Swiss-Prot record:
One of its GO terms (cellular component) is DNA-directed RNA polymerase complex. CDD domains: RNAP_alpha_NTD. This is DNA-directed RNA polymerase subunit alpha. Belongs to the RNA polymerase alpha chain family. Its EC number is 2.7.7.6. The gene is rpoA. Signal peptide: none annotated.
């Protein structure tokens, strides 16, 4: 199999602390670049775990359409600013940050007090502007997750009235682009390909770590296919036909034949289906006339039994 390598050929950090990494992967066999690019892009955009603000509590506010005295931004603006925070939490459980400030002040993300397990990537992100003589008190909930989680309206009814839920975007990768170009033709005329990938993150993780995590997820996904084991299917027992469930009484046999069969522990048509004509004749006091009677009764419901027992 052709061995390829991956090189990071460019890395940039923007003012908002988002990071862009460009990677060159190759040489690859024809068609492999598309497979690799699509697989990595899908995992990078939707499969990586990240952190996000999931709820905000504002003192004195119980719905998102309110305004706060002495604060330039309304509640919706503050919620949007909190939602856009780039945060990296190493705690798998809920983290709660708090903010208690007095104006005049322009509140920024760095003013929010979290535990040491939470890192605010873009500390200069504006949150709110407070006028002199007014206060602002916030409680911000941060969780880890994967993908996008909309507000659960049913859960909202059971939570505190003043806890404002936010649609959470846990995706640390903001954008992935890739392009494919052909390289030198190999011996025998087979073309080679080279994959160029551009990965843009929100700064809570680096493009290098994002690529590595996506690759590890794909390895875990495909690893079981390398050790496929054949499982022998156990044939299912055929369900008995309705006729087999008919009790012996409904065959309308003579009293003699009925009593002989009962003594032989024959209680239904299903039991009779295990007998041959010869087996019937071996039942005590069961003559050919009784055996013929049983054969005729079974034929009336569409069942026949063999003339002689099957030799094993």
């Amino acid at each position: 199999m052709l061995q390829y390598q991956i090189d990071r050929i460019d890395h940039q950090t923007a003012n908002d602390r988002s990071q862009t990494g460009t990677f060159l992967i190759g040489p690859l066999e024809r068609g492999q670049a598309t497979t690799l690019g699509n697989s990595l892009r899908r995992v990078l955009m939707g499969g990586l775990e990240g952190s996000a603000v999931t709820a905000v509590r504002i003192a004195g506010i119980n719905h998102e359409y309110a305004t706060i005295p002495g604060v330039r931004e309304d509640v919706l603006d503050i919620l949007l600013n909190c939602k856009q925070l780039s945060i990296n939490s190493s705690n798998p459980e809920l983290e709660i940050g708090r903010l208690v400030v007095s104006g005049p002040m322009e509140v920024k993300a760095n003013d929010i007090q979290f535990s040491s397990q939470v890192e605010i990537v873009d500390g200069d992100k504006p949150i709110a502007t407070i006028q002199e003589g007014h206060n602002l008190e916030l409680e911000i909930h941060v969780e880890r997750g994967v993908g996008y989680r909309p507000v659960d309206r049913r859960n909202q009814e059971t939570t505190s009235v003043d806890l404002l839920q936010i649609d959470a975007v846990f995706m640390p990768v903001k954008r992935v682009n890739f392009s494919i170009d052909e390289t030198a033709v190999a011996e025998g005329g087979t073309g080679r390909e080279r994959l160029t990938m551009e990965v843009v993150t929100d700064g809570s993780t680096s493009p290098d770590d994002a690529i590595a995590e996506a690759a590890n997820q794909l390895i875990e996904l495909f690893q079981p296919l390398a050790t496929v084991t054949m499982v022998e299917e156990i044939p299912e027992e055929p369900e008995p036909s309705p006729e087999a469930q008919i009790p012996l009484e409904e065959l309308n046999l003579s009293v003699r034949a009925y009593n002989c069969l009962k003594r032989a522990q024959v209680n239904s048509v299903s039991d009779l289906m295990g007998f041959s004509y010869e087996d019937l004749l071996e039942i005590k006091n069961f003559g050919s006339k009784s055996a013929d009677e049983v054969i005729e009764a079974l034929e009336r419901i569409g069942i026949s039994i063999p003339q002689s027992r099957t030799s094993v």
